Amino acid sequence: MTKFNGKFSEDIVKEVRKDFERRREERKPLELQWRLNMNFYNGNQYSEITPVGDVEQYGKQYYWQEREVYNHIASIVETRLSKLNRLKCGISVRPFSNDDSDVQTAKLSTQIVKALCEENDLPKLLNEASSWSEVTGSCFFKTVWAGEKGRVIGSSKKGAVREGDVDISVVPPYEIFPDNLGTSNLDDCMSIIHAKAYHVDEIKDIWGVEVQGEDVNVFSLDSASVGMGYNSVPDTLNGVAHDMCVVIEKYSRPTGEKPNGELSIVAGDKLLYHGDLPYINAVNEGRGYPFTKIICLEKLGCFYGTSIIERLIPLQRAYNAIKNRKHEFINRLSTGVLSIEDGSVDTDNLEDEGLSPGKVLIYRQGSTPPKLLESGRIPVDFQYEEERIMSEFTTISGVSELSKYSNVLNQMSGKAIGLLVEQDDTRLSIATTSLRMGIKRVCEQMLRLYKQFCITKRMKRFSGDNGEVELAYFTASDLQSDDLVFDNENELTDTLENKRNMVVELVRMGIFNDDKGAISNRNKLKILEILGLGNWESSKDVDESHRKKAMKENIDFGKEEVKVAEYDDHDLHIDEHLKRLLEEKNQSLIELIDEHIKEHKMMKTVDMAAQIPNERGESQNGNAIIPTN
């Protein structure tokens, strides 16, 4: 724990808490909309935002009113999420140049990124973040260096000492407070506050400070009030946790006065940390925010995004109303409305039991017999309005009946169905682009954190081709490039089925054929991999092994003596060495590689000369070769 001057500490705590309260009050209207969105998604659809600044549930106008919920919002959001979940974490590091060392460094960085994505279970985090983003409009990732992760490298009085590793977490929009709600770009904010409720024991374990706990609303992050109003909505956003304390982390971006930025961490009335931004995670080795923002839809002039649910709430209310009025009309048709003369029957009995089948109805002699009023039929306008609202659901949400129910007409061609599916996917382009850019930024921050903290040699276990395990030792100096590119353009449009069809067409056209009109073994393996059938026995493939050996020799040129082996595949080695030769600028290395290539060509000539008589069925001395039994 860092010791701070008493007066200095009190001033910092007071300033941070005052700034936090101001930002929370400014953001309250947006937070109410998020709560309303969550209620409609969960089925609490008879709620509204009141003028007093709360979300409350309004009651029935009459006791007999139908108040059922026909939740189309949930199915629309779930359909969008199922499509967003098809996005993969396929990303690669682009080398600085075509130099073999840069290429190998980029490959190592790519393997590290993939390993970190697997260790942090990034696909699961993406699904969780997408759920928050679709309902509230925004979500955030936080990428930090966790000292309690990684392999054990020693021990101390407090326990095992670990080497540390990257940690990625999903941060709901309730926990992020920008200094200006009108700034749309996260990096343009002068400061960002991340406020989260921690248990007091967890605060003591992390920062070594004891703070006083209280009951805290984990979403609004204020002290929980006792009791709820009569019309309060029983939603999950009013969850109250006990023995908690709100930890406020205020990140200030670098300025001319403070080139390394500033971070202040406050819990209760205690200052836990005050100093420079801890992570070199920005471009050009600068310090920046450890956050990444993703959105559902862009909201102009606002830091947070907007959710598709906000557009669907009026339609959902209208749909619930039309369905309930329709069922009320059906109830009148089925049970009827009885007309009786005053005092002719026992009305109490009728109200209690109704007109049950076989009921003996006794009425006063001489009075008009009870009769059912004519209710007519259900107005056709009800049906028209219901169909119109359903079509508006499709228009506004961008999710068609094809995506939700597969209700495809028989006369539609496969091409037409494909166009409809492509149109549905196109309407998700804003969310998919934001998610892809979020993945890229998270991976960039992971690499930059490794470059900052991997000072000594570290070992990483990778999943190689065909699932085999590969081990690599590296340091920060081995991770030069953080220029990331996606392996696929877009998984929603560039699907596996589209790839397979394209590859099959290219094979038919002979694009993969060599000069002899056949497909090489290497191309066969690549084709099988693209088709999703796996890179069959690639780790055991002889050609691939020769190619890897030649690439390793390219790196070893100039460092150690590289000899030509009799078992080398000379054609493959010559091709790989020629690539290095054409890219090399050092004259001494050019001469060294040239001599090495000449040795391969010489041994290749000798091998070919030895094979010619064998192909004719003759021995070296000209005599016929007679096979023995």
How should each PLM-predicted stretch be described?
Residues 1-629:
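Extended alpha-helical, oligomerization-prone segments that build pores/tubes and scaffolds
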